[in-house]
Amino acid sequence: MLHFKRCQLLKQIAQKCLSRIHVKTDKHPQLFLSRTFALAELRKSWHSIYSLVGDKNIILMGPPGAGKTTVGRIIGQKLGCCVIDVDDDILEKTWNMSVSEKLQDVGNEQFLEEEGKAVLNFSASGSVISLTGSNPMHDASMWHLKKNGIIVYLDVPLLDIVSRLKLMKTDRIVGQNSGTSMKDLLKFRRQYYKKWYDTRVFCESGASPEEVANKVLSAVKRYQDVASETFISTRHIWPKDCEQKIPAKFFSEAVIEGLASDGGLFVPEKEFPKLNCGEWKSLVGATYIERAQILLEKCIHPADIPAAKLGEMIETAYGENFTCSKIAPVRHLSGNQFILELFHGPTGSFKDLSLQLMPHLFAHCIPPSCNFMILVATSGDTGSAVLNGFSRLNKNDKQRIAVATFFPEDGVSDFQKAQIIGSQNENGWAVGVKSDFDFCQTSIKRIFQDSDFTGFLAVEYGTVLSSANSINWGRLLPQVVYHASAYLDLVSQGFISFGSPVDVCIPTGNFGNILAAVYAKTMGVPIRKFICASNQNHVLTDFIKTGHYDIRERKLARTFSPAIVILKSSNLERHLHLMANKDGQLMRRLFNQLEEEHHFQIEKILVEKLQQDFVADWCSEGECLAAIHSTYNTSGYILDPHTAIAKVVADRMQDKTCPVIVSSTAHYSKFAPAIMQALKIREINQTSSSQVYLLSSYNALPPLHEALLERTKQQEKMEHQVCVADVNVLKNYVEKLAQNQFIGKFSE
């Protein structure tokens, strides 16, 4: 078996040292290489590669023209290690002919087999290896390489690759037949690269080999440093030097636990990753799935979820479950206003964008020996989205993960209630509560913090509690993608050039959606202002204007927009923590005061900081209906009540000096009675599906949500449990569900 011994490394070090000789006289040159200097150089070069990857190889993978050979040489020089080019050092020496001659001689299929055999007979350690473009198409050889290497995918823009191949005068590569364009073949090959890589280097157009090499080293360092990306509670108090540091959590732990043990919410201990301008530009022509893969890979450490596995989850979540191939398209409404359509998922709301993915993240992260009960409070759309998302898990995962959804029995639309009830399945149930959303949300938090009850569930039923509300980081993170994608769509459609600012206007209740836009900005999306739109329950609007969060005298009013009828905005804590430079002590004081006294006031400096980025206003019920009516008359587009509220506030607050992206958070068919009232259609006592069919006859935009309507036909006949507003009663339901779902399996 061919093995590149470490003597190759010593040879390179010796050559490097000899380049630093001293000449004593011109007539009699003598070499002086002190023992101390030689050992120092040896230790320095040896340490650089082995401190980074140990005995493992750094394996560069990518299409022809990605720059693997050049980048590999640069990395080898930086680390002082052996560099192996599979084409030059393995294949041609094994075959005694050039690679192109071999391909011409044996053809595509036989070439792949013989290339694979040559790699299987090769071994190395502590080296930089540049693969051929076709190596990833041979499974056995890739498994062989992967055993002792970190595979780095050089993801170079397709147009750059095609241009380089033309300059290299490469007119044929493995797998290319007559009639197949180079561009199509390169697209086809991506599936193989995605299958094998451990970490990706996303190369912006025109990046130099030196820049790519530095990115590779950073990516490998991140991959090796499994403790580099941890999470803390928003109420975490930083210890003094003499005190013991409280262990931080990994991504997988934050997703599993949902809520921190001190009552706070999990946030990254370090700053959000950033993309540079070139990287963002390279995403302009990408699909939603491709954008999601790039962005989420940067936010989730591969030790928590391997990159290839994450890619599979993303493709499963967004591949066929959405009625629009663009997943979250942006539509020009009028003037400088654009609608971000977030309702093309299976349950017709923006919650699908995260809850089609989050269950797969959760199932991957949990240990195989435990059962998990997901507790969810919903103000309307979350319930059906959670039940739908977790119902799509595979059979084994559904046997160990169950969902209990609690919703205000009289606080959601008839359509939403029918949808929640109808989404019940073998591992998911819905319970109506005779109270409001805030009671449901607060009760779930209290259940999580009741150590006696959670301990009892663990002992008796082998069951651990978790959450799928936006308090769970795994639920919030995917929402960052669609805000970034919306901006990129405006660039790709030619409405703006990259770098031009935009405003976003978002109907806001629990602050999760708008917070995701804040995180998108921290990653590099040039969002200028965040416009917070409220209905007549305008707690957040008042807070943004005054810095005083006050719910002492407030009573929730029923509105046409139930999804934002919320008193305690959970994700606000995350944003205040970010603004206050991660002051956990302050978060404890503020939110304990809110719990005990039902209000808090932030300092003037924080109010000013908040108002630098945020503006807010609210909309009455009459203004909401009028906006639906006028928008339909002028554009033929029907807004749902939440989106109508955002449009009213955007009209009022945005200065029209840049585009504003209005988040459309639900399909209008979910609120048919309100739409019929707004459009002055004589309301008839009909079923929800009949009302939707009536609205569809108007041939308005957006089109009828067929998948939503189909599910509704089956939902109106189902039953559900209803309970009083008592946290102990909710506990009883949780125990009963755990018993029914898990007791047989746990006792086996």
In which residue ranges do the predicted regions lie?
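NTP-dependent small-molecule kinase module
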Residues: K24, H28-V53, I74, K78, ...
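Glycine-rich phosphate/pyrophosphate-binding loop at beta-loop-alpha junctions
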Residues: L167, A385-I444, V491-F498, D503-L594, ...
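Catalytic phosphate/nucleotide-handling subdomain of diverse soluble enzymes
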Residues: S391, V525-D542, V648-E716
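Conserved substrate/cofactor phosphate-moiety recognition/catalytic segment
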Residues: Q77-G116
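A glycine- and Lys/Arg-enriched "phosphate-lid" helix/loop adjacent to the NTP-binding pocket
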Residues: K147-Q191, Q686-S697
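Conserved lysine of the Walker
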Residues: K68
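Active-site-adjacent helical/loop segments in soluble small-molecule enzymes
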Residues: V459-Q493, S500-P501, L578-T657, Q721-C723
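Glycine-rich phosphate-binding loop used to anchor ATP phosphates in small-molecule kinases
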Residues: Q110-N148, T643
